UniProtKB/Swiss-Prot annotation:
This is Betaine aldehyde dehydrogenase. It comes from Cereibacter sphaeroides (strain KD131 / KCTC 12085). It catalyses: betaine aldehyde + NAD(+) + H2O = glycine betaine + NADH + 2 H(+). Involved in the biosynthesis of the osmoprotectant glycine betaine. Catalyzes the irreversible oxidation of betaine aldehyde to the corresponding acid. Keywords: Metal-binding, NAD, NADP, Oxidation, Oxidoreductase, Potassium. HAMAP family: BADH. Binds 2 potassium ions per subunit. Belongs to the aldehyde dehydrogenase family. PANTHER family: ALDEHYDE DEHYDROGENASE-RELATED. Pathway: Amine and polyamine biosynthesis; betaine biosynthesis via choline pathway; betaine from betaine aldehyde: step 1/1. NAD(+) binds at G149, A150, W151, K175, P176, S177, E178, S228, V229, P230, T231, G251, C283, E380.
Length: 483
């Protein structure tokens, strides 16, 4: 098969196979072709991964941060040197077009490794003077971490979790989504080639049962999940049993607010990026596009024109701009949401159909006249389906934007920067953009509020979530006791 890896798992520095585990077929969503067949981790594989990680972590934590940094920097350089072949694998694994994977997936992963390599030697404690006594603090690694990935950005997510964990002295056992399991294996190989000691980044494959076994193991100190809200609830509850640290990057139903003084072409471009990039399969997408009434019809007319021009087709064609959804199951889910939007009274502006057979393709779709109570405005679709809602006043837009249980992201388009900052200050979202959308540089924290998650990925903020603080009180004089 065209993308068959050496083995299903990567444990203690080498590929590991156990064919007694349940099979995991890997399907290229553009054609339905099976491109690899892996096997789910058995209890023996899970134990080997956890044991080797726990065993290797102490020596890694004792290493000088600058030495850890050199290894991660080498891994970043290797990824960049092999970006083309890695991007091809990402396209086969996910169905995303090469036009995207060449610039957005492994490239971001390399950025994360490089950023945290640079940050690691600068992580220090503080001194608190107390007269002649004083306290100093030490930032220590948590220990053995578990990372659980999603299927939309599998390799980027693996890097976003591995980079801070490893840079700060932890070990990680990573379980990718069973839908897109290939990229994490490549990352494990590259880290070993770069000089990472065996056991510090292990990859095990599997479905929810494997994740549950990892999360509930007593040796695990931290769980970082990217996934849906229902999955997040289960993982959070399981982690709570052991009072483990958690980072949860979950779903969203994010608002993108377009005021009537906005640059129309830029706002439309952002709305398209926030709904159609990666075939709409991005957690931070601005799927509720609030457009001020005075410009709504002009916005819709130009949006339809640009959406109809999107080139769909074979993701391996470098000219193709939009590929298929990740699976047949996801295709059926998205088409059901489209039919529900029709039935509930949404006005179809463009798209609305499956496209480019065979494969899991859906046309870029826009519904107008959507109301806050419609399913399309309330639930995460995870497909190329945009809901356009109109509003009259700033206060109305803010109130309706916040009327959701989600809080991952939000965007504002306006020429009035005073208004932009005023609006953003009131939006209940962890990540916001002004006159931009879905740009997520690794230098900046990323994460949500409300049901969209806890904790932050990336930026200096990630240090807080992969370390713990030890306080040391130093007494400089005699100890007085009252007895």
């Amino acid at each position: 098969m065209r993308a068959q890896p050496a083995a299903s798992h990567f444990v203690d520095g080498r590929p590991l196979e156990d064919e007694t585990g349940a099979p995991i077929p890997v399907i290229y969503p553009a054609t339905g072709e099976e491109i690899a067949r892996l096997h789910e981790a058995t209890p023996a594989v899970i134990e080997a991964a956890l044991a080797s990680g726990a065993r290797a972590q102490a020596a890694w934590a004792a290493m000088r941060p600058v030495e850890r940094a050199r290894i991660l920097r080498r891994a970043s350089d290797l990824i960049r040197a092999r970006n083309e072949e890695l991007s091809l694998l990402e396209t086969l694994d996910t169905g995303k077009p090469l036009q995207e994977t060449l610039v957005a997936d492994w490239a971001s992963g390399a950025d994360a490794l490089e950023f945290f390599a640079g940050l690691a030697p600068a992580v220090t404690g503080e001194t608190v003077p107390l007269g002649q006594d004083f306290v100093y603090t030490i930032r220590e690694p948590l220990g053995l971490c578990v990372g659980i990935g999603a299927w939309n950005y599998p390799s980027q997510i693996a890097c976003w979790k591995a980079a801070p964990a490893l840079a700060l002295g932890n070990a990680m056992v990573f379980k990718p989504s069973e839908v897109t399991p290939l990229g994490a294996l490549k990352l494990a190989e590259i880290l070993i080639e770069a000089g990472l000691p065996p056991g510090l980044f292990n990859v095990v494959q599997g479905r929810g049962g494997v994740g549950a076994a990892l999360v509930t193991d007593s040796r695990v100190a931290k769980v970082s999940l990217t996934g849906s809200v229902p999955t997040g609830r289960r993982v959070y509850a399981a982690a709570a049993e052991g009072v483990r640290h958690v980072t949860m990057e979950l779903g969203g139903k994010s608002p993108l607010i377009v005021f009537d003084d906005a640059d129309l072409e830029s706002a439309i471009g952002a709305a398209m990026l926030g709904n159609f990039y990666s075939a709409g399969q991005i957690c931070s997408n601005g799927t509720r596009v609030f457009v001020q009434k005075g410009i709504k019809e002009a916005f819709l007319a130009r949006l339809a024109e640009r959406a109809d021009a999107i080139r769909m087709g074979d993701p391996l064609d470098p000219e193709v701009q939009m590929g298929p959804l990740v699976s047949q199951a996801q295709l059926e889910k998205v088409l059901a949401y489209i039919e529900k939007a029709r039935a509930e009274g949404g006005r179809l502006v463009c798209g609305g159909e499956a496209s480019v057979s065979p494969g899991c393709y859906v046309q870029p779709t826009v519904f107008a006249d959507v109301t806050d109570a419609m399913t399309l405005a309330c639930e995460e679709v995870f497909g190329p389906v945009m809901a356009v809602l109109d509003f009259e006043t700033e206060e109305e837009a803010i109130a309706r934007a916040n009327a959701t249980d989600f809080g991952l992201a939000a965007g504002v388009f306006t020429a009035d920067l005073t208004r932009a900052h005023r609006v953003v200050a009131q939006l209940q979202a962890g990540t916001c953009w002004i006159n931009a959308y879905n740009l997520t540089p690794v230098e900046a924290p990323f994460g949500g509020v409300k049901l969209s998650g806890v904790g932050r990925e990336n930026g200096r903020a990630a240090v807080e979530h992969y370390t713990q603080v030890k306080s040391v009180y130093v007494g400089m004089g005699p100890v007085d006791a009252p007895y």
